Amino acid sequence: MEVFSRSNPYRGPVKGVVLDWAGTTVDYGCIGPLSVFVEVFRHNWVEVTIEEARAPMGLSREDHLRAMCRAESVARKWEDVHGAPPSEMDIGNMARMVEAHLAYTIAQHADLIPGVVEAVEALRGQGIRIGSSTGYTSDMMDMLVPAVEENGYRPDSIVCASDVPAGRPFPWMCYQNAINLEVYPMAAMVKIGDTVADIREGLNAGMWTIGLTLTGNELGLSEEEVAAMDPEELRRRMDNIEQRFRNAGAHFVAQGLRDCPAVIRDINELLAGGERP
């Protein structure tokens, strides 16, 4: 393996990508997990909205629950019912309930987002290895991956939050993907995802980042809902999502994974000119 240093910078090409799962490659709109979080809070006599459940998407299950419980609206609802803020014991109990139900739910949302198979083929045609990271646990992925494989997608590496010391926004899943794929340096890799947590994960790992504005959690609409939406309203929402990604530090934005092979060609040009992420 060739070694690169500051005196001998890497000038491309991109050799590996790390793709998110729900909202990036499967489950258009990232619909699958939401009902589980809503039901788990309901089991504790607390009614949360889909928007409150969606906001922390991309984090590990326990971190997702902690983020929900820190939200002022959710914390207030919990205190109104229980007389005190949710404790770590409460969060742990809810996390176990989420894991018990989520594995079966996400397996029912294994349909590939349109264009994923073609995009992955195009990336592999450029000599790029396909990694992936997810806030789901390995037990959950054991339910999801076989269904996704039947639909034509299998990454070269799958790393779960439960496989590393901490999930997003920490970089450990990206580093483990780099090891699994045998790709170095990190400037030769691109993180692609549909949440701000994905962008922060990639930046913390020293990678290029692409945020997806149409197919994922930030827009949060099914393919049918997107088709039915007024085009001007859709553009307004996507512009807002793009701005959130830019504010988080994303190098590029795209509507979906199908657009990313062209973006990566642009990244190759930047690398050839001596640019770094």
From Swiss-Prot:
NCBIfam families: phosphonatase. Belongs to the HAD-like hydrolase superfamily. PhnX family. GO terms for molecular function: phosphoglycolate phosphatase activity; phosphonoacetaldehyde hydrolase activity. One of its GO terms (biological process) is DNA repair. GO terms for cellular component: cytosol. CDD domains: HAD_PHN (cd02586). InterPro entries: HAD-like_hydrolase_sf, HAD-like_sf, HAD_sf, PGP-like_dom2, Phosphonoacetald_hydro. The lineage of its organism: Bacteria, Pseudomonadati, Thermodesulfobacteriota, Syntrophobacteria, Syntrophobacterales. It comes from the Bacteria. This is Phosphonoacetaldehyde hydrolase-like protein.
